Amino acid sequence: MAKQIQAIRGMNDCLPEQSPVWQKVEQILRQVVASYGYSEVRMPIVEQTHLFKRAIGEVTDVVEKEMYTFEDRNGDSLSLRPEGTASCVRAGIEHGLLYNQERRMWYMGPMFRHERPQKGRYRQFHQFGVELFGINGPDIDAELIMLTHRLWRLFGISEHVTLQLNTLGQSSERAAYRDALVAYLEQYKDQLDEESQRRMYSNPLRVLDSKDEKVQAILVGAPRLFDHLGEESLAHFEGLKRLLESAGIQYEVNERLVRGLDYYNLTVFEWVTNSLGAQGTVCAGGRYDGLVEQLGGQPTPAVGFAMGMERLVLMLETLELNGDIRPAVDVYLAMVGEGTEQAGFQLAERLRDALPDLRLMSHCGGGNFKKQLKRADKSGAAIALILGETEVQNGEITIKYLRGQAEQQTVTVDAAIALLAAKGE
């Protein structure tokens, strides 16, 4: 027997039993972003490597450790996309979508990072992202957060997520703060863990994000970024907080929240949860007003967020909030007796014409009545339609309810269509 080939570690199959939950999540995401005026954009999963180096930053963990990078046959360095914002900006610049325009775009699809696989974190993962270009006030930051808040309400997880906010100010303000932070950390260099020592000079703000308890204790006395912010940056942040408060959205200010990508400025936010064990981030985003220019476009204000869909699905399953998922099959058509197969397939197509949303499975592969009913029950259908020789002769169909106590009945095909239509409303 040939050796079995398995999926790559950290890259998972989504099986038919799992797909309905994903489809429900995707449906809600699409409905909500459409209600806010966003349009879908689809980008390739492979990009030139230097796109991510320029956008994310060469000294970030993503670029240094996590990207899947390879040379193609022409010797060009290509990478599987580790996130969606850089690709979305590249597409907007390339196709002239951003200059002097307000653009609202969203995307959904697989991303790739070579991380250690663990619960809710995979090497191929799916991300839902929303990006807005052309508006630079705190009002659009607030609206994006309101959009995510609406999603949590629709998914039923509002009580299980917490909004954390921070502001990173402008690049010049961060530069002054970086100098002060490095000067402070140098006093404790020997006490820092290896990762923080490495980051101290290459990307010192990331030290604030360290999970090491000793490092966190050292940071208690560190300079505050807020003390280095100018009036405009502080006013932007205060404006955002006022809008969130007026909308009834609770938040926590987390001055250690810096995000792992270099392109952010001003507003950054994360929605975090404790429902998956250790605190995990479900959704994160912020402003990146300099990224479009950094990638070759005209100066364009921008803000966006992304959420990990695996984590969202895992939350719904963990909290048992996926019980209203529609089964894959609504109705199972059983055909019993001589000459019923041809009539059965004609009936099935008639039902699909009349009821396009009906999920109808026709029995195939032969078998007696008992076997067909067993398959009908296993399919998850609520109703079995039974077409026997008598039903074919009389132009009727027998309706058997597989879930609940309703009595079996034999009706005309038109009556069956009306009954199924009423149940689907």
From Swiss-Prot:
By its UniProt entry, which HAMAP family does this protein fall under?
A: His_tRNA_synth (MF_00127)
Describe, as the record does, how this protein assembles with itself and its partners: Homodimer.
**Compartmental location:** Cytoplasm
Family named by the database record: Belongs to the class-II aminoacyl-tRNA synthetase family.
Known catalysed reaction(s)? tRNA(His) + L-histidine + ATP = L-histidyl-tRNA(His) + AMP + diphosphate + H(+)
A Pfam family of the record is tRNA-synt_His
Task: Tell me the enzyme class.
Answer: ligase
Q: What is its EC number?
A: 6.1.1.21
Record-level Gene Ontology MF annotations: ATP binding; histidine-tRNA ligase activity
A GO cellular component entry from the record: cytoplasm
- What Gene3D superfamilies does the entry give? Anticodon-binding domain, Bira Bifunctional Protein, Domain 2
Q: Which UniProt keywords apply?
A: Aminoacyl-tRNA synthetase, ATP-binding, Cytoplasm, Ligase, Nucleotide-binding, Protein biosynthesis
Task: Please identify the protein, giving its name as recorded.
Answer: Histidine--tRNA ligase
- Say if the entry is tagged with keyword Transcription regulation: no
Cystines in this chain: none
Give me any GO biological process, just one.
Answer: histidyl-tRNA aminoacylation
